[in-house]
Amino acid sequence: MAIEKKFVQEGFKKAMVDEYFLEKLERAGYGGMEINRTPMGTQITLKAEKPGMIIGKAGKSIRRYTKEMDMRFKMDNPQIDVQEVKKPELNAQMMATRLANALERGWYFRKAGQSTLQRIMDSGAMGCEVIIAGKLTGARKRREKFIAGYIKHCGKPVEELVDVGYARAKKKLGIIGVKVRIMPPEAVLPDQITIEAAQAAAPAPAEKKSPAAGAEPAKEAAAVPAPAESTAAEVEKIIAESEAAEAVTPEGAEGDEKAAAAKKQPKKKVVKTDGDSQS
């Protein structure tokens, strides 16, 4: 068998198993599956809103499904594990099934689509896309698309990050197809850049210096208290004294100068003659 044909058969078998569980476990809130091959056999992990309905009483239902995988799909030692979905609003298959049921109950397609989209975004999804196709209101088929947030449409991130779910709503006019694509909140895109805030550097510890020879006089000088500043009264007193010294008149200054000059001049001696004495 060619390798290409083997891959095609494996993909076809996986699609058939998924459709089988979707039909059998609709009431249990089926949310998809994963198939992994191990040395012990084939591990099948089912996601459901109500795991108890899949396991059944004393494990009766899950044993029946395991036997069906072995006989109908020829799987090697199948082992089924069931996981509970904590947030059904972030599971694309569950939301697609709920939307299809709402359309079958008579909800208007635009109201049902917007309501489903809002519930998914309120649960914290990064982005969501809801597509409803078929005979919605008239005789001709058409497609309505509802988009919110950010979602990838091509490339490898679509295969790894985007969750896709399909469902069908049976109405009188025909089948209406529903497709839901969800980008989970924890998805990390390859082109996403995160800038971290710079952390403040811790201050370096101060070095302990040995006391120098001239350090003690400096400490003593620093210990001497600085002279207190003059109070306002002392300042006013000094200003008044300086103004009084400047108020001396120039005449008084000249008299003082003449008195000082007279003291410096030598005194004249008067000699009396005989003529003066006789007269």
Swiss-Prot record:
Cited Gene3D superfamilies: 3.30.300.20, Ribosomal protein S3, C-terminal domain (3.30.1140.32)
Biased composition (Low complexity): 206-233, 241-252
GO BP: any one term: translation
SMART domains, sorted: KH
Stretches for region Disordered: 206-279
Pfam family name, one: KH_2
Quaternary state and interactors: Part of the 30S ribosomal subunit.
Family per record: Belongs to the universal ribosomal protein uS3 family.
PANTHER family assigned to the protein according to its UniProt record, in alphabetical order: 30S/40S RIBOSOMAL PROTEIN S3, SMALL RIBOSOMAL SUBUNIT PROTEIN US3
Protein name according to UniProt: Small ribosomal subunit protein uS3
